[in-house]
């Protein structure tokens, strides 16, 4: 949600851990004072990450599927311009989401990420290209965003 083009849209209560129900009872009430604090902190961190990296707001966008379990979003500003042709710092961000319950390893080429040789994830992991490729391990039902350095 925070890596794709457009304004992030969060369904009522997702940030607090509210679970849905079947129609017509689509949503439970908001748990005022009982929010899932870990979930709330994660949403706040994702919003701060997007606000701190303009490429996540206005960079060119491409979708990838490096394996059947993983969906990826690549956002790039190249040649000093963003997707709208406005002046922007060159940057590249990659978000990978593992839809599988098991850990997977995916491979990205340096060309996928604007020729970068190093990627730094939102949680501080550092990935270095070896022979022009990155090997990225993603835990089951998890995601990560990495920035080219």
Q: Model-flagged regions — what are they?
A:
Residues 64-113:
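Carbohydrate-binding surface patches
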Residues 30-67, 71:
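Aromatic- and carboxylate-lined catalytic core of secreted/periplasmic carbohydrate-active enzymes
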Residues 110-124:
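Solvent-exposed beta-hairpin/edge-strand motifs
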Residues 12-14, 20, 34, 75, ...:
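Active-site proximal loops enriched in glycine and acidic residues that flank catalytic Cys/His/Asp
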Residues 2, 6, 21, 47, ...:
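Hydrophobic alpha-helix feature that most strongly marks membrane-spanning transmembrane helices
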């Amino acid at each position: 949600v925070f890596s794709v083009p457009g304004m992030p849209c969060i369904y009522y209560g997702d940030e607090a851990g509210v679970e849905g129900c079947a129609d017509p009872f689509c949503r439970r009430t908001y748990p005022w004072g009982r929010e899932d604090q870990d979930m709330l902190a994660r949403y706040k961190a994702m919003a701060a990450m997007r606000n701190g990296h303009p490429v996540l707001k206005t960079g060119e966008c491409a979708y990838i599927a490096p394996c059947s379990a993983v969906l990826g979003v690549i956002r790039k500003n190249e040649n000093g311009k963003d997707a709208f042709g406005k002046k922007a710092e060159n940057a590249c961000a990659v978000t990978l989401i593992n839809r599988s319950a098991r850990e997977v390893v995916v491979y990205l080429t340096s060309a996928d990420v604007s020729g970068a040789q190093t990627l730094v994830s939102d949680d501080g992991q550092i990935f270095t290209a070896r022979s022009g490729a990155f090997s990225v391990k993603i835990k089951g039902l998890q995601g990560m965003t990495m920035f080219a350095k």
